[in-house]
Each structure stands twice: as structure tokens, then as C-alpha cells.
Amino acid sequence: MSDDLSMKCGLEIHVQVDTNSKLFCKCPTNYKDVFPNTNICPVCIGHPGAKPMPPNKKAFDIAIMVAKMLNCEMITDKDIYFQRKHYNYPDLPSGYQRTSVPIGEKGNFLGVGITEVHLEEDPGQYKPDLGTVDYNRSGTPLIEIVTDPDMKSPEEAREFLRQLMRLFRYIGNLRGEGTMRADTNISINYNGIQGKRVEVKNVNSIKGVYKVLKYEIIRQKNILRRGGEIKMETRAFMESQMITKSMRSKETADDYRYIPDPDLQPIVLDNSWIERVESEMPETPISKEKRFVEQYGIKEDDSKVLVSDLDLADVFERVIKDVGSDETGISLAVTWVRNELKRVLVYNKIDFFESNLKPEHIIELINSIKDRTISQKIGKTVIEHMVDQKGEKTPKELITELGLTVIEDVSELDQACEEAIKNSEKAIEDYKSGNIRALNSVVGQVMKLTKGRAEPGTVVEMLKKKIDG
């Protein structure tokens, strides 16, 4: 008898807003490259009597933008106020976390329901193994996105998060996967037995969420198979062991003793505020994908690859603008941005931003190929050197330095063709017998002899004249 197994998963995703100052004070939000406990003040370390400033307006703008791009209904008919969420942990100096009521709710992204979007403050960083706490992070604005339990497999959850992180890159002012933390809620139904919901806290990567779900499915299935009962509990992800470990029974809202924060005035999201934020919203990745296909006539797969990296998509459009928006220009842009540049970036495990290249570098390279200063084969070599050297030299500088210009000396090219013909008797015989493709082998010999500096079209013409007489 085969197993009848299904799962439901919902996520609570926390992502930092990249603002200059914290949510309720003027302290800087930089905490990674500074000495511990330096970017702090009485507000963000919870000193008694310290009063918070009004919430960071920029953080609110970004939260509104996120809610709108997740197709949420905006809360405009009642006040947005902050609550105190009480719990005791060393990284929470005041004993409570300030968290807003929903800014937007009842949204949908890629078929997954969005329960709500709200703002809250990040706690500090506690290191249990050292017994130390760094409060530089305390008070940094966080956006929390709570989904409905609509994901039916680890693969669905992984793809949802990938697309969400891509959306965040387009929005900007969000610190993305490097600071993302997700609380993963999962329940399974095994052969008609419904297990209780289990929450796994603070999973800090997309890969981690995927591994948690795979592990929990197996763990919960084995419990139900043996006739046991799934406890409603909170678990921790032990990343080094790729397992989850029980922390405590699952909390309810009552456990956190939510109360409105008396030190903060309610905020009203009026239509003019929302309309202003909407006017500043960028094009979404999905919209850009469709536009690239319709406007430039490229394949859907090519569009997806380009749009997966916002900077790469921008370079693609810059190339078309400078090289030409006709069929030739678009073809060159696809070949050299989507295919060759992307190939080298993937090989080096970096994105365009990390390469330090400029759009002008790619345009200069393509123009060098277009005007036959270099061959396409040499173009591939140049783009590899450009990425290796972090954009320190322009294509023209590299072409000159490496001696990669197309051979213009006819006698040098003639000599290479003669030698290739001499070494390709079988290919020449096949070509003369009507196998036109056999000539490609001879062309390849010439390209090898000239180290790619010959222009293929010129080589073909010269070979045909010599062979055909």
C-alpha cells in the first residue's frame, strides 16, 4: 500500500529595510563592520524612560511598496499603531519588541496568499556559545511578510522565496537574502491522519528553508507511521547537522501579551501617501519579463535569465540603446549579455554588480566585434579577462595589451590557410565531393593557427578561392 502524504507550509519572512537610521532612533543601521555595541543609544537598548522617536518614514514607504507589490489591500480605514510584543531573551533588552499591526493584508504573490505585511524592530545579536550580545542591530527596521499555508512542497516554498528575493532586489532598500530570516510553519497529513502545526524558527537562507521542510516531512511522517502524535511546538534548525530540535511548546498570541505602545502615536495611511509611494514603485520582474518578450522579440527563457539579475537587465537595454534596436542589435545584445556575459558571471559565481564592470565596457566590446576589430572568438576571451580583472581595464586596453586584434596582413592569413589546407586532406576531399560542412574543419584549423585572430567570414572566402580554384 502506497503512502498518502501531503503537506501545508506557511512562512513568516523577515527582511531588513536598508535605511540610514533605525526604526525609532537616529542610530546608524550598520552593524556588520563595526565594533560591538557602538551604534546604540538609550532607545535601542531599552533604557527605562527612554522615549522612541516617531517611526522612520523611509521604512514605512518601503513597507507600503512591498505590500502593494504583493497585491495587498492597504489598511486605510483605521489607525496603524505599534504594539509591544513581550518575551524574554538576551537579545531583547527592553523585554518587548515593537511591532506594528498590519499595513497591508489579503494579498497574493505567485498564487500564495499573503496574510499580512507589517513593520517591526530587529532584536540584537545573541551568541549563546560565547554568552555575548551585540545590540548594534537592535532597532533596525524589519518588514515581516506572513503567508497563508498555501505551499504544498519544499520545492514550491523554495521557488516562492527565490521569486520574493528577486522582487526585493527590484524594490531596492531591502537587504535581501543575506539578512532574511524565515519562520517555517509546516503540517502534514499522512494516510488521513492530520498532524499539528510545527514552527521552525529563524531559518536564514532559502536553502535552509528547503532543507527544514524536507527534514520535517520525514520526521513527522515517521512519528505518524509509528502511531505517535505530532506536538504543536517551536523547533530550531541546527544547520551544521541539517536537523531540527525542539525548543518549546508553540506560543499563542496571548503568550506574548500584546499591548499598544503608549509612547508612539498611531499613524494614518491616507490615499495621498499610498499614491506617492505607488508613483515611485519600480517595474516588477514579471512585468519586465513580459515587456522584453513583446518589445524586443526575444525568447521567454532568455528574458527570464536577463531579468533574474536587475543589473544585467539594465545592461541589456543599454546595449540595445547604443548598439541598435534593430534585429542585429538585439541579436548582439542577447548573444553577448544573456549568453556570454552571463556564462562568465555564473562561472565566477558573481552577479553583474559584483563584477565591477560598467555597461560601457560591454557596449565597447560589442562594437569592437561589430566593426570586426576582433572576432567573436576573441570577444569571448576578452570578456573573460574583463571579469577576471574586475573591470580594471577596458576592452580596447585588453585587446591591445594581449595583441588580439583581427589579422589584417593578407600574407599572414594566406600562409595560415595554405597550412590548414595541407593538413586537412580528408576534409578537402569531402568538401570537393559535395560535403559543404567539411569546410568548417579547415576553417577551425585556420582559427587555431591564428589563435582566433582571423575573421571567420574572410577565412571562408579565402579558402573557397584556393580550393575551388
From Swiss-Prot:
Residue ranges the record marks as coiled coil: none
Spans traversing the lipid bilayer: none
InterPro entries per the UniProt record, alphabetical: Asn/Gln-tRNA_amidoTrfase_suB/E, Asn/Gln-tRNA_Trfase_suB/E_cat, Asn/Gln_amidotransferase, Asn/Gln_tRNA_amidoTrase-B-like, GatB, GatB_C_1, GatB_Yqey_C_2, Gln-tRNA_amidoTrfase_suB_CS
GO BP annotations, alphabetical order: glutaminyl-tRNAGln biosynthesis via transamidation; translation
Listed Pfam families: GatB_N (PF02934), GatB_Yqey (PF02637)
PROSITE patterns: GATB
Entry GO MF terms: asparaginyl-tRNA synthase (glutamine-hydrolyzing) activity; ATP binding; glutaminyl-tRNA synthase (glutamine-hydrolyzing) activity
Free-text function comment from the UniProt entry: Allows the formation of correctly charged Asn-tRNA(Asn) or Gln-tRNA(Gln) through the transamidation of misacylated Asp-tRNA(Asn) or Glu-tRNA(Gln) in organisms which lack either or both of asparaginyl-tRNA or glutaminyl-tRNA synthetases. The reaction takes place in the presence of glutamine and ATP through an activated phospho-Asp-tRNA(Asn) or phospho-Glu-tRNA(Gln).
Subunit-structure text: Heterotrimer of A, B and C subunits.
Family: Belongs to the GatB/GatE family. GatB subfamily.
Name used for this protein in its record: Aspartyl/glutamyl-tRNA(Asn/Gln) amidotransferase subunit B
Taxonomic source organism: Methanococcus vannielii (strain ATCC 35089 / DSM 1224 / JCM 13029 / OCM 148 / SB)
Gene name of this polypeptide: gatB
